[in-house]
Amino acid sequence: MGRGQIIMILVGLLCLANESYSDVIAKSSLQMCENTGNSDDPYNVVDQKACEKKLIVTLSVRSGQNGTEFLKAVTNVSKVYDQTEKEMARLYNPFIITLAKTPVKLTYPYYYLAMVNNKPTERVVISDSKWHASGSYHACSDAWDDEDALCGFYTDAEGKPIWDSQGFCCRCTEQEKWRGSFNDKNPYSRAGINCKLFGTQAAAHCMTFDDLWYTVNEVGLWQMDFSIHVKAYDLVVEKVGNKTQSKWVDGGEIVIGPTIRSGVGVHGRLHATFIGEFQSHKQFPVLTTKYLLIPYVSEKVDPKTHPQFRNGPHDYMLIDKHEVNYKSSGPHECDKIGVSFSAFRAQAPMGCSQKQGDCLHNQPKDYFEEDTKRRASGKTPYYFPQKFGKLLGVNQRKDNNHFVLTYEVDEVMTSMVTLQISADDVILIYNRAEGKILRAYAQDFEALSRDGNLYVIVQNIGLVTADFYVVIKECSVGIGKLLEKAASINPQQTHSFTFSVKAQQWKGGDNFCIVQLYDARRKMVDSSNVTFRTTEPCVCASSCGCSCFKNGFKCTKREDRDFTKTKPKDSGLDLGFFPKLWNKIKNVWDTVTSVFNFMESGWALLGTALGLLSLGGLKAFLGFRKTGSRIARFGFGGANKGRVRRRDGSGRMVTMEFNETGDRIDPETKEVIEPRNKKKELLLNLFFFFILPFLLIYHLVGWIRWRMRKPGSEDEEQAGTGDEQGGASPLHNIEARAAVDQFLQPDTIVYHSYSQDDYVAQFLINPGKRFCMAGRMTSLSGPSADQFRFDLLQAIQIYEVIDNKRRRLESVNSLNAHYFSRLLNAEAMIDCLSLKPAFPCLNVNRKRKPKQK
């Protein structure tokens, strides 16, 4: 084999979580020298010491191997023993190449999305109504943006109230009050309020937040992270004085892997290339369907003392995405992480019959406490990262500053590496040591669960670091197969192997497994028998409870009842309106009594009297002013203007006319026949608010009497008026009949008065506040002689009213005469018709100064 010859060496690296192999395929001969630890020089093969020699095709290099295996390449060694020719050969400049692979890690990048609260809770506020409110419906307010809302409002960063943060109110219905007062079974109340007659309790249910918050993070796809370290050592001979000394000089290190796939040594004698990774027989966990929840450090939470920060990343939680609602836009659902104010408030009214805290279950704190109990009892957690493998922690990537969740791979992985070295021969030195099983045991666990673990403690009793393999050779029926595990153990040190045991049958009982220990040469050095017991699984089914069983699942049956398949017929007496009526009466009574209770104080009574007198004086003052007459006439008092229908001293309805100052005048001569009594009006208005309640009662009694009057009573009152129509006529005296007759004279023009609020005003252009339209009256034939119709004299609008002055329109406004036609009786004619226009007339040219009413 010529000097400087370039050969290709393919190295396949097989690794467990902390172990790796390298398979070397080369043309050079490989010699394996067994190092038993009795020599100070681990490379005694160079000094021609005795060793076992054979051709090596594969070489294992385990990550974290601590130098148990070396790939030693020698070029131009001075002496080499040729097994074929049975003689020594001379070689020069030997060198050593070592390969090592770090533990394989899976990194899961995660990205921040939102914040959710650790444990929203429900706060209940019980309230009784005050003097100004009666009944439980007034004791609690949950209206939006109501400053008196019993729960108050949460506000955002801008200080604006958050929608639905006011919670909801629960009150006693009238049926519940009746049932509570008569010792009937009262329905469950969420707040436990006391529902009885005259009771005023109500409860506000408010959602509040815990001091601890969690960040919600999106988890990305996993990436494999490891590195392969290749080192070269050159043997250099130096002459010091009269002595020749040799030493190994570090020729540099090449680090390759998924990120840096190739490299060259310092002296260029070694070139390493990472080809790729073989696929594992087992799929790695995919966490893209879950959110990573990380507790958030704030001023209100001390991470040194808070229990949910105690174990760092080991207490983070991986929750299914469908269990988290972090978006404020919805959907708003109860009993999910990130429950919103809208979801909590949407419980009403049915939520009042639910338990306190309903809608606020399945929060991060609940998941944390559940997994903490499982971990303390030796069971596999549901949500902690431990469920998916051995968690190493959270690291930060150097390339993009992203944080990644890091797991250690517990599976055999294979990497392919190509080495190009200038060499003639490769010598393999292989460490081997004796070992023994100190203890092998398994804890009892529940069948069909993932809580079984088998532990094997191994000790290296040799003098060098060596590899050991633990194989679970055989187990009882129903126990799943367990994968082989391996580790490099330092001299006189121990290592603990953990295997996950699964029982794949319902039936519990005694079980066993045989544990075997092998050394680096695959020679069995020790074995042990492990016994353990599995229990029947305990299953919890909805509405059936929990039970541990042996012969399959059974659910408790419901007691047979005679269920009604069709809607039952209505029966019995429904008195549901009584509670409503009683509630209204009680509310009025409570209000009245609260007013009287307030009036018990002498100062309050004096202040109220002065206030009522002041209001009466204001009413009288406005009555004496021209613009305030309407206010003063409310109730009684105040100036009357124009024509007014009222009863005279004999009780008959007559039409009275008043001038601008409120004095009564004669309709024909316009002379004052009854001056206005201002002193009387002033006195009545001063005490008006004192007698207002009695005045209202008086009018109420009069209205009731009018409603209860028999149909014939009006006819009897009208007897003797000369009306032969049997009482259908509303005319009560000769004066009224004469006025009606004037309106019905042939060719007589009458004027119909309107206001801007009347229906016909919408068809006119700027009619003003009060106006009139000229027309004629027609007597209609029928069962009653007092039926008349008003029709427009001409269906056009000639004038408009601007600033209380009549002005001619630029063009005539055509009108629909049908809208202005109106059927009138005698009383209506007297009220709205006149022979002279009282207000500006809009459809005739007659000019007359209008009278302002």
Swiss-Prot record:
One Pfam family per UniProt: HAP2-GCS1
Domain of life: Eukaryota
Residue ranges annotated as Extracellular topological domain: 23-603
Tissue: Detected in sperm (at protein level). Detected in testis seminal ducts.
Record-linked InterPro entries: HAP2/GCS1, HAP2/GCS1_dom
Glycosylated residues in this chain: 529
Bilayer disposition of the protein: Single-pass type I membrane protein
Keywords: Cell membrane, Disulfide bond, Fertilization, Glycoprotein, Lipid-binding, Membrane, Signal, Transmembrane, Transmembrane helix
Signal peptide extent: 1-22
Keyword Transport attached: no
Coiled-coil region: none
GO molecular function: lipid binding
Disulfide bond annotation, renumbered to this chain: 33-51, 151-206, 170-352, 172-195, 334-359, 475-513
Parts of the chain that traverse the membrane: 604-624
An example Gene Ontology biological process: single fertilization
Annotated localization: Cell membrane
CC annotations in GO: plasma membrane
Cytoplasmic side: 625-853
Any further remark recorded for this protein: HAP2/GCS1 family members mediate membrane fusion between gametes in a broad range of eukaryotes, ranging from algae and higher plants to protozoans and cnidaria, suggesting they are derived from an ancestral gamete fusogen. They function similar to viral fusogens, by inserting part of their extracellular domain into the lipid bilayer of an adjoining cell.
Functional note: During fertilization, required on male gametes for their fusion with female gametes. Probably initiates the fusion of gamete cell membranes by inserting part of its extracellular domain into the cell membrane of a female gamete.
Similarity remark: Belongs to the HAP2/GCS1 family.
Name of this protein: Hapless 2
Organism per entry: Nematostella vectensis
